[in-house]
Amino acid sequence: MPTKAVQQFMLGTVLGNENEARQTLAAMKAAGYDGIELCGFMIHPIGFMVRLLTKAAGMPVGKGGSLDWHALVKEAGLQVVSLHTDLGSLERDAKAVADEAKSFGTKYVVITGMYRFDYGDEATMHDLAARLNKAGAALKAEGVELLYHNHNCELRHVNAEKRAYDILLEETDPQFVNFEFDSYWFTEGGANALAWMQRLGTRMKLWHINDRGTRISGSAVTPILKTDSMELGTGNMDLDSLMAQALSVGVDAVILESHRNWVDNSPVKSLQVSAEYLKQYT
């Protein structure tokens, strides 16, 4: 079984201080997770406005950036499976990013998509693929591998035949760029996540797992319900088929990430419920 991990972004509301962070990481470990995926902007202090904006977007990052994450993950007995960053930071100083990743004992640096960026423009996507190749080559020279993490924006069509993700797959060099696939976001975007995973094959090094469904009790006003993320095995995604594909290509880690709609509004309770689904694959 690959390393079972949780993305740090899921934990923003329960990392308010050192003691709370210790308790959260201990609960993760006790639930059966062996790893954590760190976000560059959550392991360093960030400004109040950034925290405010991410909270307003429904994805609070919390105040954990001032904590000693090297000490926290070591004390919890967790493996750092990757470090999330942005392409701009890589282009400015790839060595610094690589050194930070290696200081946590991980070989993977992950680009989490582009902001204020037109994924529907074909020329822009060709350029992005070239930039990723260059950044990946710079990281490889430092002994670190670059992965690209998708959301749903990569499903935009750049022409009648291809989507943005097609260009990334076809024009990035596997020597320098591979992928962390998020099946939730492609499912949310209306795509066949399994087919894309099969197409990625062994270029999928890490897998972000989540489920999707409806959390409701009692009667509904209309027959159309809003769907959102759910604990693993409680939604409607065919996770068993996705897991079989991920295991068949030898992914290094299966990483839980959800941003909201947690049971009892608790990310810790949510990851504990999801851990029960993952236990069948231990």
Map each language-model feature to its residues.
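H/E-rich (His + Asp/Glu) clusters that bind or coordinate divalent metals
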Residues: 235, 242-243, 253-257
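Tryptophan-centric aromatic hotspots in well-structured domains and transmembrane helices
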Residues: 9-11, 25, 33, 84, ...
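Active-site acidic/histidine proton-transfer and metal-coordination neighborhood
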Residues: 79, 84-178, 268
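Active-site beta-loop-alpha junctions enriched in small/polar residues
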Residues: 8-12, 39-41, 85-88, 114-116, ...
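N-terminal pre-domain/capping segments
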Residues: 1-108, 178, 276-282
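Acidic/histidine-rich catalytic cores of soluble enzymes
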Residues: 36, 139-236
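Generic structural signal for well-ordered alpha-helices
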Residues: 25-26, 66-70, 94-98, 129-136, ...
